Amino acid sequence: MIIKSKSILKDNENGLYLVSTPIGNLKDITFRAIEVLKKSSYILCEDTRVSKNLLDKYDIKSKLISNHKFNETKNLSKIIELLKSDEIVSLISDAGTPSISDPGAILVNECINKNIKIIPIPGPSAVSTAVSISG
């Protein structure tokens, strides 16, 4: 299994990017997340209608693929082929970190099995936010 985390995306560095998205305020996205999403050939979205709000705000024009709990198994072979053909593919959820109470775990497991790079892009965290205001 190859898991990488780098501060700057190199040109044409393919793999599956797990990109965290804002939990409430669209301005809470990181610069790195925007950079990765703009360089992605494809963005896998839990709900393209919800994701479009975020992507439009930051002028991100990557191709969208709907990837939710009802079609993620069906999409799996197509997405793996994209990743094997050196495409940059990002996975986002409607809010927060993909694969945590969201679709994506099946794809991540398949990438691990196929030795495809997985690059996490951290972002806002409900846990750290809750802890910070707990006193």
Residues of each region from the PLM?
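Glycine-rich, highly charged phosphate/nucleotide-binding loops
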Residues: 71-79
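Short glycine-cluster motifs
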Residues: 85-135
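Glycine-rich, flexible N-terminal cofactor/catalytic loop recognition
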Residues: 2-70
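Short, glycine/charged-enriched secondary-structure capping and boundary segments
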Residues: 32-35, 57-60, 79-81, 103-108, ...
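Short beta->alpha junction loops/turns
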Residues: 22, 69-72, 96-97, 123
